[in-house]
Amino acid sequence: MELNSLLLLLEAAEYLERRDREAEHGYASMLPFDGDFARKKTKTAGLVRKGPNNRSSHNELEKHRRAKLRLYLEQLKQLGPLGPDSTRHTTLSLLKRAKMHIKKLEEQDRRALSIKEQLQREHRFLKRRLEQLSVQSVERVRTDSTGSAVSTDDSEQEVDIEGMEFGPGELDSAGSSSDADDHYSLQSSGCSDSSYGHPCRRPGCPGLS
């Protein structure tokens, strides 16, 4: 929208400068055809013809239009960079420079939009990657906790076996087996001692033969 308004101002400035140059040589120039401008000009001409003093009304309208144009140009000078020779700018050169500046801003806007889209894609990728790493971390923690629970159960079973207590019957059976072992060891030692002292009188002892 601003570019269209600027183009209209550019055409108007070109027309004014061309008309000023042609007025110096004694001939006039036609303004490029524009539907809106033609309708406004027709309406203005009708108002001028209806007035009592056509020439003065036309001069007032022209003065008002030029004042608005100067106001727009001053605003344009404040918005765009003019360079070191800003005081020597004509209306046409000012509008051309403003047009170039608008194109430069549009190009910067396109580049910024492209960078923004690229950053948004990278943000989505990193977000998905973070979610994947979070899921893997939770699964790893769950696996480690399960393995530690299994090792804890095994150690508890070993402790129960080592700390097992025997009842009275189990102790008697264990004691009788140990007494039999002691009795057998005494017999063996008695037979071995008989070779140095008295002969062994137990049946089955080799000293009785």
From Swiss-Prot:
Keywords recorded for this protein, A-Z: DNA-binding, Nucleus, Repressor, Transcription, Transcription regulation
Chain intervals for the UniProt region annotation (Disordered): 137-209
**GO process terms (BP):** negative regulation of DNA-templated transcription; negative regulation of transcription by RNA polymerase II
Q: Which cysteines are joined by disulfide bonds?
A: none
Localized where? Answer: Nucleus
What cellular-component terms does GO give this entry?
A: RNA polymerase II transcription regulator complex
| A Gene Ontology molecular function term of the record | protein dimerization activity
Chain residue ranges for the region called Interaction with SIN3A and SIN3B: 6-23
PROSITE patterns per UniProt: BHLH
In this chain the bHLH domain maps to 53-105
Determine the domain of life of the protein's source. Eukaryota
Answer yes or no on keyword Repressor: yes
Q: What does this protein do?
A: Transcriptional repressor. Binds with MAX to form a sequence-specific DNA-binding protein complex which recognizes the core sequence 5'-CAC[GA]TG-3'. Antagonizes MYC transcriptional activity by competing for MAX and suppresses MYC dependent cell transformation.
Full protein name: Max dimerization protein 4
Gene source species: Mus musculus (Mouse)
Query: Upper lineage ranks?
Result: Eukaryota, Metazoa, Chordata, Craniata, Vertebrata
